[in-house]
Structure formats: structure tokens, C-alpha cells
Amino acid sequence: MATSSIRSRALGLSRRARFETTRLPFIGRRYKSDETLNRISSKITQPKSQGASQAMLYATGLTEEDMSKAQVGISSVWFEGNPCNMHLNDLSGIVRDSVLRAGLVPMRFNSVGVSDGISMGTAGMRYSLQSRELIADGIETVMNAQWYDANISLPGCDKNMPGVLMAMGRTNRPSIMVYGGSIKPGCSAKGQKLDLVSAFQSYGQFITGQIDETERFDIIRNACPGKGACGGMYTANTLATAIETMGMTVPGSSSCPADDPKKLVECENIGEVVKNMLREEIKPRDVMTRQAFENAMIVVNVLGGSTNAVLHLIAIADSVGIKLTIDDFQAVSDKTPFLADLKPSGKYLMNDLYSIGGTPALLKYLLKEGLIDGSGITVTGKTMKENVASWPDFPADQDIIQPLSNPIKPSGHLQILRGSLAPGGSVGKITGKEGLRFEGTAKCYDYEDAFIESLERGEIKKGEKTVVIIRYEGPKGGPGMPEMLKPSAAIMGAGLGQDVALLTDGRFSGGSHGFLIGHIVPEAMEGGPIALARDGDRIVIDAEEKVVDLDVPTEELDARRKQWKAPPLRYQKGTLKKYCALVSDASHGCVTDGPI
């Protein structure tokens, strides 16, 4: 079958010819499969009343025997304009052939995507979080309208992962994710290991005179050497690892680099995996249980993962009918040590973790230490514990994952803070390297670029304790809750990490580090206290007490509230206008179909 499929492609034969490479026994005017795997697609391929449906399918190249086979929707978030996604069409072709070899009918389709790295710091970033909903809605639409029996999704960039998982949760048909993989590290002319965050931080270094133009250009020219998602424990790798932990990928998918031959092997073998899922009726809601989400939250904290995991795991849980809250994250963070010396706060990249065994070795270690539960079923049909049992242990001399006896921080870095500035909650990314308490005077900016301009003018001084507030960047105010990587990277690049805390109703990239508090609820557009803060106000952030307070008398805040007026929405037409009308707040995952 494999040889026949390769020969068919080489000769440039039609899709119909490729489908004809394997035939089932002919019985009368029907072809019969030895298994009934087409439980969904049979609704259109079998009834005489659906003859027009069948005529259309014959036109796509299906044969008579194909009408009795299960149909697998292969959804790729491929587009050329992003290294995270540019190779996914090639991978989906390998997946298609694998599905064909398994005796199933592959049906490829595509979804939209946004490059967070390219759109970062621009109005384009307002479309990023909203693309998660478009991906989920698009895959759900095609899977249901086309009556596909199973789904294989190939995501690459940040919002791709939660988008495809939300669609899987909604449709609840046998589904599996194949992660596109991480990019290799870049290298500067001086031999310095680089990644995308190096490029973002180079601007702060440049405007403060730490590097010249030649050095700046060397960094941006060499930071991203090819295909794959951003290489640190940023949002894409955080989500991919969490999803593998939940059991929705084959072992090793999240840590295997984009250009590693094993990524091709993963795609070549995926057809039999999904066939077994169809046979055993393993569905997303069987895999993504509350315990699976508990495991995912633990692993995110162990790895020092992105704050976006809070938003996205809440939304994925919502899609399978599980109510996950920001308080669940705090409960996990309180009992989970931070162990991984990975960027952005550490020095290693995902490729380095892969070199010592990757995600399966990490899960095996955490199982041995009793931090996670390995009893849940996964897409392989086995439990997590069974999946990793034969996987090699971490080498004894590795220093990427610290032992439990010597954690980087004894509790998690994700902190849920409430207080007079964020009564509905906020999410802090506090590794401990920047301290656990910050007190300073507010400098308020109503949009991201206003802060960058202020930094360029030298208005943020080293030695002064400043709390930068960037507001009207929430789900409705942004809209789309854009990420503040450009400001946070500029702060760190300018050497102001110990002098500045950054608060926002927007989000932070997984590449951000420093004293950062985002996801502030209520957002400024809704009249939350963040909208009432003024330059010179005293702000107190205490990670141990889990508070973020605006130290202004109640009477003064009441007076300011009476004077406050909501600004007009930035978009009065189009997809972002619709998004503003539907989106929930950050504490409820920014879902658009109503939180459970």
C-alpha cells in the first residue's frame, strides 16, 4: 500500500486513482468493510435519499468502496507567512497518505491563522486571540457540515492549539493533534544563542545604547533560522506540552522539533492511531477529563509556562463541559514547584528539553515523584503511565529540570491576584527572580504605543519604582486582548526589569518575563478600576498575599468613576465588532459561545 501510494503521487495520478489503490471485497452493488467505523459519515454515504451527497463525493475522487469507509477530516492551520505554520501543508500531506494506508478516507481542509510574532506590537495583534475562535468555529463547522468521522489537526502557532482542541471538544469525535514542532535556535555572529524574544529585546538594548545598529540587525537577521514555533517555553510550546499531558497527542509530539525526522515518522504513523480511536470509540471527552486538566495545570507550573495557558485551558475545558476557574489554577500553583530552567526566565529552549527525553521523560519523572496522575486514557488507547513506561529517564547530569529537592521556586509561577485594582481577578507571571512584592507609582497609558513612545523619550527612569499600566487593551477594549510582548521585552532590554512592573487588561506573550500582571478583570472598557488609575497613584503588588491594590481612597475612586466615560469601540464593523459583542471576560477564558 505504501509503495502504491508513493507511485501514484510520483505519476501525478488523480485523487480517484490514489483512492483505488486498496479495494475491499465487492458484494452485489455494495462494498463491505470488515469494521463499522463510518458511524458519522454513513449518514450521507449510505441512504438512497442522500444520493446527491454521494454524487458530490464521487466527484471528489471517491470510489464505491470508499463510501463504506470512515472519513477523516485533516485540518491544517497552514499558511506561508509564518515559520510556525509554513511547513504544515507538507505534514498534512504525509498525514493524508497515512490515513489512506490505514484504509480510511482522508479529507484535507485548512483553517485561518495569525502570526503572533509578526503582528506583535501592531494593530494586527488585535486579531490574534480572536483567531482562536475562528479556528474552533471553522473546524467545528467543516466537521459537522461534512459529517467526518474523525479529526486530525495540525497546528503551529500560539492560538492554533487551543483553537483546534476547542473544536475537538465541541464535536466530540475521535480526534488527535499533531503539533508542528519548535524552531531551532538561531546564532549571532558572536556565537550567542538566539530566539524570537532576542529580537524583541534587541530594541530596548538599542535605544538605551547597549548595542549598536550592526549588532541589532545581526540579532534580528539570525534569531529565526527556519520552520517551527518559537523555541522557548512560550505560548505555543506551553500549550502543546499541556495538550500532550492531557493525552490528546501521541507521546513526544510537543517536544519533537519541526525539522526532526521523527516529526515525519509521527505523521506517517498517525493513520493507524486514529483508526484505533475509531475502532475503540475514544473521544475527546473521554480523554480531556478534569484529572487531565489538573495534570496540565501542574505541568504548566513545573515548566514556567505562559500565562496564556490560564485563558486557553479554561476555554478548552469549557468546550468539553468542564468548569475550570482561575482559582483552580491558584490551588495548583500553591502546591506545584517551578522546576524548569527554560526561556523566557531561564536559559534553555525546547530543543534542549527534547535532547534529554522531551515531554515523555518529563511526564515519567513527574509520575515517579507523584506530582501527576497517569491513569487517564489517551489517544493511543493506553494510559499516560503506559505510554511513558518504556521511555528513557532523564540523564543523571542534566540541569534543565531541577530536582524536587532544589526547585527554582517551591510553588508555581502563575499567581491569581485580586484586590482593588482587579476585583474580578488577574494573572501574574512571577518566577521569584524579580521578587515577590513590588510597590511603586503609576504611569498610565491608554494604548501600547503610548508607552513605547514614553520609553523612547527616556521618561521611565532606572532606580525609580514605576508601575506601568497599559489599559484599554482587554477583550473588548483592545479589542482582542493583544499581547504586551513589545513593551515587556523593551523594558527588559532596556535593563529596567528590577525597576518596572507592568500591569494590563491585555495579555502577555509566553515570551514575556519580568514583574508582569495581566488579564485584569474588569477591563478598562467595562469601567474597571484599572480605568480609574492616574499617574502618581500608589500601586501595591504582593504575590505572597495574592493582591494587586490601587492605594486610593474609596471616595476619590467614586468621584473618578462618576467622571469616567467609556470610549467608543475601536472597530465599528467586521469580525472584531462581532467579537466585542460576544466575548466573555478573561477570567472566564474569553470564550464567545458563553461560558458554562
Curated annotation (Swiss-Prot):
It is found in: Mitochondrion. Mg(2+) binds at residues 116, 158, 483. One of its GO terms (cellular component) is mitochondrion. One of its GO terms (molecular function) is 2 iron, 2 sulfur cluster binding. DHAD activity is not inhibited by the dihydroxyacid dehydratase inhibitor aspterric acid (AA). Keywords: 2Fe-2S, Amino-acid biosynthesis, Branched-chain amino acid biosynthesis, Iron, Iron-sulfur, Lyase, Magnesium, Metal-binding, Mitochondrion, Transit peptide. It holds the Pfam family ILVD_EDD_N. Pathway: Amino-acid biosynthesis; L-isoleucine biosynthesis; L-isoleucine from 2-oxobutanoate: step 3/4; Amino-acid biosynthesis; L-valine biosynthesis; L-valine from pyruvate: step 3/4. Binds 1 [2Fe-2S] cluster per subunit. Coiled coil: none annotated. Its cofactor is [2Fe-2S] cluster; Mg(2+). The keyword Iron-sulfur applies. InterPro entries: DHAD_IlvD/Edd (IPR050165), Dihydro-acid_dehy_C (IPR042096), DihydroxyA_deHydtase (IPR004404), DiOHA_6PGluconate_deHydtase_CS (IPR020558), ILV_EDD_C (IPR056740), ILV_EDD_N (IPR000581), IlvD/EDD_N (IPR037237). [2Fe-2S] cluster binds at residues 84, 157, 230. Its EC number is 4.2.1.9. GO terms for biological process: isoleucine biosynthetic process; L-valine biosynthetic process. Residues 1-18 form a transit peptide. The keyword Iron applies. Belongs to the IlvD/Edd family. Dihydroxyacid dehydratase; part of the gene cluster that mediates the biosynthesis of the sesquiterpenoid aspterric acid (AA), an inhibitor of dihydroxy-acid dehydratase (DHAD) effective as an herbicide. Performs the third step in the common pathway leading to biosynthesis of branched-chain amino acids. This is Dihydroxy-acid dehydratase pbrD, mitochondrial. The gene is pbrD.
